[in-house]
Amino acid sequence: MFVDSVEIIIASGKGGPGMVSFRREKFVIKGGPDGGDGGDGGDVYFEVDNNTDTLASFRGTKHHKAKNGAPGGTRNCAGKKGEDKIIVVPPGTQVFVGDELWLDLVEPKERVLALKGGKGGLGNAHFKSATKQQPTYAQKGLEGVEKCVRLELKLIADIGLVGFPNAGKSTLISTISNAKPKIANYEFTTLVPNLGVVSVDEKSGFLMADIPGIIEGASEGKGLGISFLKHIERTKVLAFVLDASRLDLGIKEQYQRLRLELEKFSSALANKPFGVLLNKCDVVENIDEMTKDFCAFLNLGAQKLNEFGLEPYLGFLHPHLTNDFENNPNEQSALFVLPLSAVSALNVHALKFVLLEALP
């Protein structure tokens, strides 16, 4: 089950109490105080684990508490520190206290101290003085800290697929990567984001995210809009997946409406580097003219794929992706326009190289 938001209560351990005890030795009637200090309470840490991409493990487990410190012992023996609580989260997890962002956990294997355990109490050996040789007092340990926090997951991927429902994003990610999403010929088949690893060759690859289809008004929360859109905020490059076979909504209109939703949600998201994939091109007769016309619509001075050793079937690249172009393109310029068919795998092999080159 994919879960991207959950509330939990975290608490550090209480410090152990100090000990009240006195030295007992043969021929010593009243030995001095030798009560040890209590152990410190356990700390709470968040740790990033690359092997998980959901917060589902937190469902049904609301309280996460470190152990209390042990009491001090006799003969000045200190109590054992309470066991720390390590809370494992996927990369991209944000921790909120109320509406305020407290922690942003991104780096693999990153471990961050969230709550410090309570200090252990001092044993009675600390309270001996010239006027009080037999102190019968020891400190209690300090209480731990408790917080109610909200965990929000924003997936981290190199490429984010953006498109309307039934555009073929799930089929594409299942064809090009190791992801196995549910696929069917109706809208909203995908109800949760999917992550897939795309292997280009033995040394190269990237992570791709397929978010559920965007509908108009998604930026205002329609459908599950905002909860979906947040998952592509961290992606490096966006790939708009357009359905070239649609008769009721042309590819230009699809692109404009998708871009409008991104702009409404976040200007930073709308300004990310992007490319366009014209899916289902194998059932469109005039795909060549459609692709050229769309490139002109984007003001893309593109060049055909076969000029750069890729498959000689239609697709166009921004010169930025070639070795003979040294300057960076305009941020609003498409990096590529590539017709493909996720079902028949047409141009999918070329797509791997195009996406790899598009990454900064």
Swiss-Prot record:
Its main location: cytoplasm. CDD domains: Obg. The keyword Disulfide bond does not apply. Its EC number is 3.6.5.-. Its cofactor is Mg(2+). Pfam families: GTP1_OBG (PF01018), MMR_HSR1 (PF01926). Mg(2+) binds at S170, T190. It is an enzyme of class 3 (hydrolase). It is found in: Cytoplasm. Belongs to the TRAFAC class OBG-HflX-like GTPase superfamily. OBG GTPase family. HAMAP family: GTPase_Obg. An essential GTPase which binds GTP, GDP and possibly (p)ppGpp with moderate affinity, with high nucleotide exchange rates and a fairly low GTP hydrolysis rate. Plays a role in control of the cell cycle, stress response, ribosome biogenesis and in those bacteria that undergo differentiation, in morphogenesis control. Monomer. This is GTPase Obg.
